[in-house]
Amino acid sequence: MDIDLLSNIFFAMVRTGTPLLLVALGEMVCEKSGVLNLGQEGMMLFGAVTGFIVAFSTGNLWLGVMLAMAAGMLLSMLFAAVALGFNANQVATGLALTIFGVGLSTFVGAAWVGKPLTGFEPVVIPLLSDIPLIGRMLFAQDLLIYLSFVLFALVAWVMLKTRIGLIVQAVGENPDAASAMGLPVLRVRTLAVLFGGAMAGLAGAYLSLAYTPMWAENMTAGRGWIALALVVFASWRVFRVLLGAYLFGLASIIHLVAQGVGLSIPSNLLAMLPYLATIVVLVLLSRDPIKTRLFAPVSLGKPWQPGH
């Protein structure tokens, strides 16, 4: 396998892993606050269709990105109102949100299926993009991928080095103690949910405005569910989220790698690998639930109200 082929593989790995990275970062912050939102797939799809329609209608890709994030936040507000405001079951609410988001995106985007759009183009950084092996992977990507690098660094810094990160984690570990210390538990959790919605909307916008600049029904292809498994796989650790996202991205393009090295394996079989990998990860984690619980936020998925 020559260096040019490896460079192309790493380049494609980052492209395919970026939507997983974005949505998983948002979900990780949400879960760190103690809230389990299973509505990622629906929010991604609604963000994707909103971003595409806005960008197609106005010719402004960045306006599409911003309104895609707003669309994801809108659905996450609905989740927060039901799950946090009315203390509803978070799992059931998240599943309902996914069903609602999938149906809403299909309805809204029915007239826009297959329409062409000039999306974000790669921005090549001179000299740096010529670095062997990693040059194209890091310095010849589109602006949304560069934005994902910045957002990853920002989330890592906030969660690991700032008081805000400590507050989010305190709320997720022991909301009663956090409340007794004067921390606004419900407000922190609501903001974490909204951040997760914005990141899911951004991931959807990346799919419809950069990765494959078009709108197609169910174009997320289960990435929201994979991201949920990815957060558990990463043990709620931000750097492992980055690694896991790109590993799943690599699994998504393994059929192209096989073609590049001349392996005659059916492409449909290889295309199943990301989903098989998700199942394998969940099975392996379920074999050691005690270890998984050690890393999970203690109050994850548990309803909480002041004074209860």
Question: Could you tell me what each predicted segment is?
Answer:
Residues 137-215, 238-243:
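Helix-loop-helix "hairpin" substructures at the membrane interface of multi-pass membrane proteins
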